[in-house]
């Protein structure tokens, strides 16, 4: 287990998962139509944790594919929502699945790419910003390989003064987004908003006084 894997496993084992939200992300509800995903289309949720957003997408009629490093997160997800799953193990990857939900427990960088059928869209609420800068180019490349031509990514990022605090979540600039997805046909900024300070906000509690949130829709050519 490398340093990054140990870090995330430790957070889940100790229950330090303030990044997990109990409500469906309002930006997903507001902007899911921007993806133009066909009915019953396949949506990838990388680094999915136990996000309730996945259940919401399934209820909208989509087939959801989740990839998560920590098995505890997936087990909590299926238990908390009383989902009856089938199980499978392929190499180092473990699979929990139903007819419209396919959850992989593995390191996304080590997953045999052939195991993931091409997807119509990707929903990234907190995956890119969970990765240090040196890993983000490889992550983007992996996701784009799984995305069908013409498919879209709904991506949430944030910016703050990272000289004061090291992530995760990491600050990702608009310039990095433009560079990372320059091969795509379209990069559209759907939302830019200064975050309102809340008592349980991790970054504000660490002394960051200003955080800006962004929502992007990126279309592959």
From Swiss-Prot:
PROSITE patterns found in the cross-reference section: SAM_MT_TPMT (PS51585)
CC annotations in GO: cytoplasm
Alphabetical list of InterPro entries matching this protein: SAM-dependent_MTases_sf, Thiopur_S-MeTfrase_Se/Te_detox, Thiopurine_S-MeTrfase, TPMT
Amino acids binding S-adenosyl-L-methionine: 12, 47, 68, 125
Enzyme Commission number(s): 2.1.1.67
GO molecular function, one term: thiopurine S-methyltransferase activity
Source superkingdom: Bacteria
Catalyzed chemical reaction(s): S-adenosyl-L-methionine + a thiopurine = S-adenosyl-L-homocysteine + a thiopurine S-methylether
Family: Belongs to the class I-like SAM-binding methyltransferase superfamily. TPMT family.
NCBIfam families (UniProt xref): PRK13255.1 (NF009732), TMPT_Se_Te (TIGR03840)
HAMAP family the UniProt entry points to: Thiopur_methtran
Protein name stated in the entry: Thiopurine S-methyltransferase
Annotated source species: Legionella pneumophila (strain Corby)
Phylogenetic classification of the source organism: Bacteria, Pseudomonadati, Pseudomonadota, Gammaproteobacteria, Legionellales
Gene coding for it: tpm
